Amino acid sequence: MTSVNLSRAPAAITRRRLQLQPEFHAECSWLKSSSKHAPLTLSCQIRPKQLSQIAELRVTSLDASQASEKDISLVQTPHKVEVNEKIEESIEYVQNLLMTSGDGRISVSPYDTAVIALIKDLKGRDAPQFPSCLEWIAHHQLADGSWGDEFFCIYDRILNTLACVVALKSWNLHSDIIEKGVTYIKENVHKLKGANVEHRTAGFELVVPTFMQMATDLGIQDLPYDHPLIKEIADTKQQRLKEIPKDLVYQMPTNLLYSLEGLGDLEWERLLKLQSGNGSFLTSPSSTAAVLMHTKDEKCLKYIENALKNCDGGAPHTYPVDIFSRLWAIDRLQRLGISRFFQHEIKYFLDHIESVWEETGVFSGRYTKFSDIDDTSMGVRLLKMHGYDVDPNVLKHFKQQDGKFSCYIGQSVESASPMYNLYRAAQLRFPGEEVLEEATKFAFNFLQEMLVKDRLQERWVISDHLFDEIKLGLKMPWYATLPRVEAAYYLDHYAGSGDVWIGKSFYRMPEISNDTYKELAILDFNRCQTQHQLEWIHMQEWYDRCSLSEFGISKRELLRSYFLAAATIFEPERTQERLLWAKTRILSKMITSFVNISGTTLSLDYNFNGLDEIISSANEDQGLAGTLLATFHQLLDGFDIYTLHQLKHVWSQWFMKVQQGEGSGGEDAVLLANTLNICAGLNEDVLSNNEYTALSTLTNKICNRLAQIQDNKILQVVDGSIKDKELEQDMQALVKLVLQENGGAVDRNIRHTFLSVSKTFYYDAYHDDETTDLHIFKVLFRPVV
């Protein structure tokens, strides 16, 4: 097997594979030739197909040394056309999925379907009110005699099977199906011993004894009524009921409303005052069915009819899920790096969330009189991120007297995923939002304690990668996270349709866990990466052509600069912006190095008419000065007169400060932001706008401090972020200026440029070289499969 140096791949490359060891071992020879830094190491394999695509692009295009930046972005090949077509098909599918979301898609719950099947005709006939539920049960028994999700969990299978057997027996239907179900329970009940308690379905210990009693009353034979484990479950139920104040269920909406069918004798009419606006009790079809059976309430009936409409005759475990499905869909699309394709749909979703938002937060479905920290945290974060006005003090509703945060009132054991979403929400903090500071400390410590024990406690979702996801999230705070780095990792963590959610039964959420999302994200990631690799070839040749090494610029530094640009603005069509970002960063360092180290003085007049007039105090530097001037000319080449005028102005301002010895990391950051904004079409008047000036000033201060932290190696991290009170306050102020809509003259995208640039400086200060090397290869060189 032949080793291939991708960074210097010839135009006619053959299908060969980079031979790489498991982690950090093979060296990139082009980078290794740098005299200033250690070689960059690889940690992944690059497929032959990926190499051939780069070669195909390169052969099809003009030679990279002669091609303009625009030429690079316009290259088309048969493979690229095919990928683009697949991407467009996937986008169309997802758009349709999102825009037809309605009350949210969710799989059928055999348990809830069985409870509804028990309802007798409300007009008094000896018939079921909902015969479709019985039909669904009859047609969905698994081969082993059980009912439940394909992901095996004995809690899910036992409860679903017991309920379905009782439902069929109550109408004396399908004795053969009943017999198979009874046999399954009898032969598998022992598996409850030692089963993972974290996978126990919600309310399991409350409803299993209830259905065992119903089975006894119906005369169902051979069920393991006297099995020690069944008796143990019954004892647990009695103990729980003793701990619940007798009248609590009638006083206020609590999680008890979720399992009313398992609570025994209740004053059912008293419960109606706690009914949600849609007629449900905590969005639970089975709990609502129990109330309907005892009250014949019309609103309960209407709710159940609605819940059955889109489930093929069965019922979901919760309905509606409009809030849950919308928030998590947006989150998944963003983290997978494909949200840009669905901006209209995302706004449509968030408008809906804003319209149903309550002062006490939200739950999985609208109008429930109940809220949880999971949905509320996700809502706070996404609404803030997209410029909606939302008060984070809503999270105080979940703060207990001892300072701890709880998923909801009455929660006995906290799970990892809600606290992780609280932590993520708390990182988008504006000045003065004390509740988010408290939430950050609590959630970080809560999750860190779980990680130290090497075991997460999770009751709501079964995900193979949740541990790794949370571990990474605590190591990589939002300020130090770049979009493409996040996508590269989340593609490893996201299971698509493989995620299983835990309610009264196991369930799936197509708008959240969807294989098409992942397929689209992989296609898009690899398409972007292929484009980035072509641009990286261009950057290497630019490095050699402009003799950047003579200015102290290492090849490693070049790669790092390009990586920061590509990991932030990654879209294939934004080649010019990426290259401008990377080259601006490099050129500013070249000029600073030339002026400060060699002692040379450069003189440029305001209008740049005298750009070619370079006066050198050292004759031997004339060659370098000429190279520097030519490189600067190349950077500005190709822009229209209006854009060129603005670029020269901001560069002139920056240059004067460098010559006066006032250059800094902050000034470099503002130069970069100004250059990117101008090339994006910024109106010259905006440069002097008060809001724009405030953004520039904050960015300067923040990035100057971050550069000092990086240069002086004084990094201290507390609760997942850099320990520097003033820096934290300034970052919060910048985030507020960027995210909060105030009707000002500065466009949101322009504001975001300052935050994006600042985050790259934060990234540089926060992550060590080894971590950055890994990120570089995940983003630029490791194809996703």
Curated annotation (Swiss-Prot):
Superkingdom of the source? Answer: Eukaryota
Q: Where is this motif: DXDD motif?
A: 372-375
- Name the needed cofactors: Mg(2+)
Task: From the UniProt record, list the reaction(s) this protein catalyses.
Answer: (2E,6E,10E)-geranylgeranyl diphosphate + H2O = 8-hydroxycopalyl diphosphate
List the InterPro entries hit by this protein, alphabetically: Isoprenoid_synthase_dom_sf, Terpene_synth_N, Terpene_synth_N_sf, Terpene_synthase-like, Terpenoid_cyclase/PrenylTrfase
Q: Provide the protein's localization.
A: Plastid, Chloroplast
* GO MF term set: copal-8-ol diphosphate synthase activity; magnesium ion binding; terpene synthase activity
EC top class, in one word? lyase
* Alphabetical list of Pfam families matching this protein: Terpene_synth (PF01397)
Extract the SUPFAM superfamilies matched here: Terpenoid cyclases/Protein prenyltransferases, Terpenoid synthases
Use in biotech reads: Escherichia coli expressing SsLPS and SsSCS from Salvia sclarea and CrtE from Pantoea agglomerans can produce sclareol in high-cell-density fermentation conditions, thus being an alternative, sustainable, and cost-efficient route to sclareol and other diterpene analogs.
Q: Where does substrate bind?
A: 240, 459
| An example Gene Ontology biological process | gibberellin biosynthetic process
Q: What is its main location?
A: plastid
Which positions carry the signal peptide feature in this UniProt record?
A: none
UniProt entry keywords in alphabetical sequence: Chloroplast, Lyase, Magnesium, Metal-binding, Plastid, Transit peptide
Q: What is its EC number?
A: 4.2.1.133
User: Which GO cellular component terms are attached?
Assistant: chloroplast
User: What pathway annotation does it carry?
Assistant: Secondary metabolite biosynthesis; terpenoid biosynthesis
Q: What is known of its domains?
A: The Asp-Xaa-Asp-Asp (DXDD) motif is important for the catalytic activity, presumably through binding to Mg(2+).
Q: What does this protein do?
A: Involved in the biosynthesis of labdane-type diterpenoid including sclareol, a diterpene-diol that is used as fragrance and flavoring, and has anticancer effects (able to kill leukemic and colon cancer cells by apoptosis). Sclareol can also be used as synthesis precursor of ambergris substitution fragance products such as ambrox. Terpene synthase that produces 8-hydroxycopalyl diphosphate from geranylgeranyl diphosphate (GGPP).
- What family, per the record? Belongs to the terpene synthase family.
Q: What is this protein called?
A: Copal-8-ol diphosphate hydratase TPSSA3, chloroplastic
- The species is Salvia sclarea (Clary sage)
